[in-house]
Amino acid sequence: MADTPSVAVQAPPGYGKTELFHLPLIALASKGDVKYVSFLFVPYTVLLANCMIRLGRRGCLNVAPVRNFIEEGYDGVTDLYVGIYDDLASTNFTDRIAAWENIVECTFRTNNVKLGYLIVDEFHNFETEVYRQSQFGGITNLDFDAFEKAIFLSGTAPEAVADAALQRIGLTGLAKKSMDINELKRSEDLSRGLSSYPTRMFNLIKEKSEVPLGHVHKIWKKVESQPEEALKLLLALFEIEPESKAIVVASTTNEVEELACSWRKYFRVVWIHGKLGAAEKVSRTKEFVTDGSMQVLIGTKLVTEGIDIKQLMMVIMLDNRLNIIELIQGVGRLRDGGLCYLLSRKNSWAARNRKGELPPIKEGCITEQVREFYGLESKKGKKGQHVGCCVC
């Protein structure tokens, strides 16, 4: 991976994908002769807040919002700028990168301040978030060759999704065969820079061959009232584990606010949805992650992707439009095990997908649907195949 200019990594939620770039960035920051400046982009503002908290711990890296870089230029101190996809696609960011060498030389009177890594987390969204694809168009104008290395990470990007996602942003796509790095260096067609290289895929899920999320107990339950059942589950959780946290995924922004209003008498609640401003989303996410007294986070499906909370013990999903990627991302927040409930009203599971989108998950065995998504071999009849999800 070290010698490959562009890499994509698919690893199960909870694997520790952050450390795949965090440790190399710390090593780059420790170099005395050259200052490397890297950039990390995540899909949503909610995830941005979580990343800023995690990566800024222990003081090993100087971390700042990419908005600072876009508005003011490089400050001479920051090791890692963190932003969202909208920042990555912005003309102002593209222009800053294009003018990097001239700006650095004029401002700092040196050429020893260089662009390091471009890191994109949960990059499957470039292909699967159909309604946002027009927003990603500006990424194709970025000079990828200005960076020393590009790293694309996801817990839900099988080869077909990964290849399409990379091509969406103007890259070559995945390498079609295993290529030795010396072969890449010898190729006359790949001499222009990073964007000319096919991206090498590291599929850690297939290498492990185990169906992800087996550590989480997943229960599909038909109920008369989703909110009432969710309330019962939460009350039971906090009676047994009062220091724990829970996430509830609602189907609409209105439902988010209604649940937050009615549950405040029982729990300390934080709610987030897309109609809030960016600064408010960041503030509320930080409050839920860092304040041990906050118990329940309520939001639409985007609230779960990539967020990492140690005390989280339960995820409840009330949205019957979730596709398999959204399900995996939601369940994957339970890093050390826990309970995931999918609550559906009796005789009401009839969600439809929009054109171009992945279809909603089906009623039935969740493990089997996860296995099919990742292209793993079926082990029907073998002990352990359905641990934590069903008894079929």
Swiss-Prot record:
Keyword Disulfide bond on entry: no
EC number per UniProt: 5.6.2.-
Induction info: Induced in absence of telomerase TLC1.
InterPro entries, A to Z: DEAD/DEAH_box_helicase_dom, Helicase_C-like, P-loop_NTPase, RLR_Helicase
Cystine residue pairs: none
PANTHER family associated with the record: FANCONI ANEMIA GROUP M PROTEIN, HELICASE WITH DEATH DOMAIN-RELATED
Protein name (database record): Y' element ATP-dependent helicase YFL066C
Native source organism of the sequence: Saccharomyces cerevisiae (strain ATCC 204508 / S288c)
